Amino acid sequence: MTDKAHQCVIIGIAGASASGKSLIASTLYRELREQVGDQHIGVIPEDGYYKDQSHLSMEERVKTNYDHPSAMDHNLLLEHLQALKAGKPVELPLYSYTEHTRKKETVHLEPKKVIILEGILLLTDIRLRQEMNFSIFVDTPLDICLMRRMKRDVNERGRSMDSVMAQYQKTVRPMFLQFIEPSKQYADIIVPRGGKNRIAIDILKAKISQFFE
């Protein structure tokens, strides 16, 4: 059993790609950190746990279906969550969107009272759900997600508009319908309109603040 001094609350935030879940996670982290200090709260992006593909050629890497659960190293993520709950620090992996594989460097994370976990496929894995104290699904219409994704991937990740659209049609939308949307049933809280839903963010802040009392 986890020592009380090391108890770690895990909050999962899931939803479609570009649904606004990262914005909600970063807003909650920033505003709660101002209240309690960064020694008590941390964020783990699921994106960092894409499997290492350094053994594959670039041609093979770009063919990976990044919206399928098999693309994720959830075993490592689970191991890290359990380590944090046991009061042990972890080295978070980082992922390169331009090289399509894991970076060599990592980010050191000490145990925190609250960890915000965010990613598209979190709720598809029962083992991860069992580690969460509660979970959130950001429910944003797919057409809005597509527009946001195109803007983000072209401007921030060096992608072409054609490649973003092709990936959306081939894997992003089908995988959302097959895996991500059905996982919404496991969420404790549904947040519409993404990161612009200030009322929802304030409610979530109040809920999370209870764990610091």
Curated annotation (Swiss-Prot):
Record has RNA-binding as a keyword: no
Main location: cytoplasm
UniProt entry keywords in alphabetical sequence: ATP-binding, Cytoplasm, Kinase, Nucleotide-binding, Transferase
Top-level lineage group: Bacteria
Coiled coil: none
Matching Pfam families: PRK (PF00485)
Binding positions (ATP): 15-22
UniProt catalytic activity: uridine + ATP = UMP + ADP + H(+); cytidine + ATP = CMP + ADP + H(+)
GO biological process: CTP salvage; UMP salvage
The enzyme's E.C. designation: 2.7.1.48
Gene Ontology annotations for the cellular component aspect, listed alphabetically: cytoplasm
Subcellular location: Cytoplasm
SUPFAM superfamilies, A to Z: P-loop containing nucleoside triphosphate hydrolases (SSF52540)
GO molecular function, one term: ATP binding
This protein's pathway: Pyrimidine metabolism; CTP biosynthesis via salvage pathway; CTP from cytidine: step 1/3; Pyrimidine metabolism; UMP biosynthesis via salvage pathway; UMP from uridine: step 1/1
Cited HAMAP family: Uridine_kinase
PANTHER family the UniProt entry points to: URIDINE KINASE
Family per similarity comment: Belongs to the uridine kinase family.
Protein name, per record: Uridine kinase
Annotated source species: Yersinia pestis
